[in-house]
């Protein structure tokens, strides 16, 4: 049995920055969507761009996975059945980017999930975040959940200074914006190296291009003492694909 699939429609589309669109989805199918899933992933199910039917096909049919892409629950308003997803968009012409760039109120999008939340211990003694713009929605959603006395650092790579967002975060969390079009930046590793090697009681979030995630994970394994049960490390995309 696969994840629950829901048909939704676009309620609104807003440009958050040059490389980020906020799309709010709605529909009666969201009536049983769970609360407290901010930062969890869902699978967006897109219409087949080669067909005239602009509704995505739901179900576990042959080839269905080619129309699915993972995204993050930015927020969910249970009362108004409004699911917010922030879409990172770039020059790459692909199924998801093309849909997001052209999305308008009334368009259809399927949603499967949600999965589990990303940050594994919001009450940890310290927090470290490393993510490019594709991970910004998950980082932003998690920062909003942290207790007021939380401390730590968030290193966020963005392609343009205009992609900076105003984040709601505890005063003890230092935000480091890494403005560079090179998504394979070494700045994440420099940020990790600037921390103590003793990272017990530290919740660590890593989400970026596959080789960057591998590099950071390797440094942790070879140089740091940390609790693997509070590490989230995921390749959100792969440059080789």
PLM feature spans:
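Extended, composition-driven regions rather than compact fold-specific motifs
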Residues: 1-241
